[in-house]
Amino acid sequence: TQKYTELLKKYSYNRIIILSHTNVAADEIRDEILKLPEMEGVTKKAMKYKICTIHAYCKSRLVGRKEVFSYEDHKNLSMIDSLFNLQRVTESEFNADKHKFYRYLADAYGRGKTLKEHWKTCDKNAYKPYSLNSIEQMAYPYFEYKKDSHVCDYADMIQDFIDKAVEPDIDALIVDEAQDSNVPQREALDKMATKAFEYYFVGDADQTIFEFAGSDADYYHRLSRKAEQLEQGHRCGKTINNLCKRIIRPIWDYYGYERTWKPTDVIGNHYHLPSLDKRCSAMTTLLDKIKHTDETFLFTYRGTPSDSWVKKFFKQQGI
């Protein structure tokens, strides 16, 4: 909010745009901005497309197809072409980008590659049961369906903005979590900033974790060499801070730089659990915290997404 407050001294809020990658992040930023004394009397509705996702902003600037390709559209396509049924998905799975055909198209587009080009370098197992041949066969009816039904996908929102939209008349553009932006998104952002006096990327090159979808770690590390660094952390205590530094050290060494990460005043503790199947002192501590504190716990995983292993653990422990 500090940078936004500085911008408000020079520009109207109507001419300042903040974009992020998720609705949750955009909503959180909007809520914080609206708490500023300078924003008294400004409504959420007035800020709908002043602080939003990149896709929402691109879509708002377009005339024409507005409806997003939905699960109902997918079911319609599945009746037209049986290849779409090679992988059956529920509506929630479809909305979570679990269908591998649509995932492949999004990843190829995000990396700025054709379907054939992406196949040469991608993890082919990640898109099973589809092959390049089946994906190419499905692409034509998919594109025709979107055209005939006047619907668009998220890639269309970005590309249509790049190809057709007029550069917005704004004074400042701020991009949150900029390191997650893929190839076409960066092109769209540059177009948005054409008339802007100030253009900011906010993010952390060390957190570029979406390279599979087109984000470019090398690009953001080059960009961040002369960036303003935020040194004081507000989340992690000293123990976790030191652990994170050890984990990220190879990245710093690879790019040849050092960063200052100051922890909070909390010391904190680090526990190692070899597995959730065997008792150990760390397991005893974990169970005690789960059962007797109001702390929040996040269980993460590697590989195929599944919550079955942690549900089994909870049942075994009577949680």
Annotated model-derived regions:
Residues N23, P168, A172, Q179-V266, ...:
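Conserved helicase motor core of SF1/SF2 NTP-dependent helicases
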